[in-house]
From Swiss-Prot:
Pfam family for this entry, one: Histone_H2A_C
Family matches, as InterPro entries: Histone-fold, Histone_H2A, Histone_H2A/H2B/H3, Histone_H2A_C, Histone_H2A_CS
Name of the molecule in the record: Probable histone H2A.3
Species in which this protein is naturally found: Oryza sativa subsp. japonica
PANTHER family linked: HISTONE H2A
Gene3D superfamilies: Histone, subunit A
A biological process term (GO) from this entry: heterochromatin formation
Sections of the chain in a coiled coil: none
Family membership noted in the UniProt record: Belongs to the histone H2A family.
């Protein structure tokens, strides 16, 4: 019966590594797997599905955080607030399409002034007045 089971004297227990660290992710693969199973989205959940979903969620979070950080820096702030997330999402075409129906609490509205309400430029109005006189 040689080669079966663990040796009696070996105490070299292998350290457990999480699925997140195996995949090189920060988002919790195990927790996402648990949510997928508990949510009854399907009868069975494949082994790769929670890893893939965690990677997608991590990418989206990193993208939003990067754009929101840029918006905060543009406003000379060091802390990201919901307003910066709103500006980041709405100024990005793809994220705006993805989160179009989402309301961000305390995000405010996008700054927009209709072209008809803007003051006319002095140079163009002087040329138009000269053309009317002739």
């Amino acid at each position: 019966m040689a080669g079966r089971g663990k040796a009696i004297g070996s105490s070299a227990a292998k350290k457990a590594t999480s699925r997140s660290s195996k995949a090189g992710l920060q988002f919790p693969v195990g927790r996402i797997a648990r949510f997928l199973k508990a949510g009854k989205y399907a009868e069975r959940v494949g082994a790769g599905a929670p890893v893939y979903l965690a990677a997608v969620l991590e990418y989206l979070a990193a993208e939003v955080l990067e754009l929101a950080g840029n918006a905060a820096r543009d406003n000379k702030k060091t802390r990201i607030v919901p307003r910066h997330i709103q500006l980041a999402v709405r100024n990005d075409e793809e994220l705006s399409r993805l989160l179009g129906a989402v309301t961000i609490a305390n995000g405010g509205v996008m700054p927009n002034i209709h072209n008809l309400l803007l003051p006319k430029k002095a140079g163009s109005s002087a040329k138009a007045a000269a053309a009317d006189d002739e």
